[in-house]
Amino acid sequence: MVDSKKRPGKDLDRIDRNILNELQKDGRISNVELSKRVGLSPTPCLERVRRLERQGFIQGYTALLNPHYLDASLLVFVEITLNRGAPDVFEQFNSAVQKLEEIQECHLVSGDFDYLLKTRVPDMSAYRKLLGETLLRLPGVNDTRTYVVMEEVKQSNRLVIKTR
């Protein structure tokens, strides 16, 4: 986690921000094309990309896959409430959930429950199995609430990067 007081993004200039915006749009863009779009020659552009990678602004590159083509059509969000009787229940839960490939995201949140999970499964029977055989058996789980997504209205991994 980055210390919010240091705010490393403040040191990015307009070109760095443009590079990040272009890479968010297309992570497979060639360095030559990227350099044209941000107004640099290829060598300094590549040097900036490598620096942004070293500094942690760019954490990696991935392919966006179509879940409907890959037997993962059902998107489900799950609220998890833990039994807070055990002193290390949060650490145990965190460790256990890291091992579950079916869980795409897990967030510790404030409010009436402790965690919000995002999972994708083939269908409702697969989710029922995941819930009954896995999620309810995670360390400290006291209660769950399930929200089945009926329609994905918007999905994006892009961050808003102001170019100043």
Swiss-Prot record:
UniProt keyword annotation of DNA-binding present: yes
GO molecular function: sequence-specific DNA binding
DNA-binding region: 31-50
Cited CDD domains: HTH_ARSR
SUPFAM superfamilies for the chain: Dimeric alpha+beta barrel, Winged helix' DNA-binding domain
A GO biological process held by the record: response to L-leucine
Domain of life, source organism: Bacteria
PROSITE patterns xrefs: HTH_ASNC_1 (PS00519), HTH_ASNC_2 (PS50956)
Database matches in InterPro entries: ArsR-like_HTH, AsnC-type_HTH_dom, Dimeric_a/b-barrel, Tscrpt_reg_AsnC-like, Tscrpt_reg_AsnC/Lrp_C, Tscrpt_reg_HTH_AsnC-type_CS, WH-like_DNA-bd_sf, WH_DNA-bd_sf
Domain HTH asnC-type: from-to ranges: 12-73
One annotated Gene Ontology cellular component of this protein: cytosol
Cited Pfam families: AsnC_trans_reg, HTH_24
Transcription regulation listed as a keyword: yes
UniProt KW keywords: Activator, DNA-binding, Transcription, Transcription regulation
Record note on quaternary structure: Homodimer.
Function: Mediates a global response to leucine. Exogenous leucine affects the expression of a number of different operons; lrp mediates this effect for at least some of these operons. For example it is regulator of the branched-chain amino acid transport genes.
Designated name of the protein: Leucine-responsive regulatory protein
Annotated source species: Klebsiella pneumoniae
Gene that produces this protein: lrp
